[in-house]
Amino acid sequence: MHISPMPNRKTDINNNGGFSTDMIGMNHSYPEASYRERQQIFDAHLSYTLGLLYFIGHDARVPEKMRNEMLRWGLPKDEYTDNGHWTPQLYIRESRRMVGEYVATQADCENRTTVDDGVGMAAYTMDSHNCQRIVIHKDGKAMVKNEGDVQIGIGSPYPVSYRSITPKREECTNLLVPVCLSASHIAYGSIRMEPVFMVLGQSAAKAACLAIDGGTDVQQVDVRQIQRMYDEDPLLDDTAPDIMVDDTAVEPAAGSQWQRVNIYGGYGPSLYKLEPSGRSE
């Protein structure tokens, strides 16, 4: 397990390794399941997770040092007090997604494809936990392998297309989808961060207002008006926007010797550059 310390002597525990807190493959039917079936899936995951923690702390086959360390911990006494100190919901990272006007893919994450109608930026690693366990037969022997784990970094932040949050026009003209947006499995593993959802939600709200005020379909909204909102008031708090000088600012760069500073300092297809002195004037 990957254990990250948090305030008040709490931890954020995540899956780590080939056999851990992920109940691999047992969640596949959740999106299409009834409420009763979803509860059964939840109960199975609860039993698996609590059983794993109990096993580590009590089973004689586990090294004593590890058992003693596990027994130092317990469920948070001040959280979910009406549910046995356990969350009543599963963490749903990815589920059904819309197939919209544009499907974001790995090429977008790697800036091999650049869109001009971006209404938000994403920057997280292309990330997926294992999706299934499969049996491999080789040389007369069988072994179980996990399949689906992906941890691939990206070069720089990339724009998320407005068309990825709008459905195909022939299917619907008054729907905006900032979370279950149109993206491949790999691209969604990068886009799916809460700050990105917040920005896409704000963009969707702005688009809804523009569509209503203009009496148009959401596909006909002038995306430049959404982009202008972020250019003029990026924090949406009426403060002045930052002044960004990079390799697209031709006049400031003229006559100066600029260099790439950090590939992670980029914004879309543009990468920040500074003079050797470090000055950004």
Q: Whereabouts are the PLM-identified features?
A:
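Flavin (FAD/FMN)-binding glycine-rich loop and adjacent Rossmann-like elements that form
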Residues: M1-L236, A240
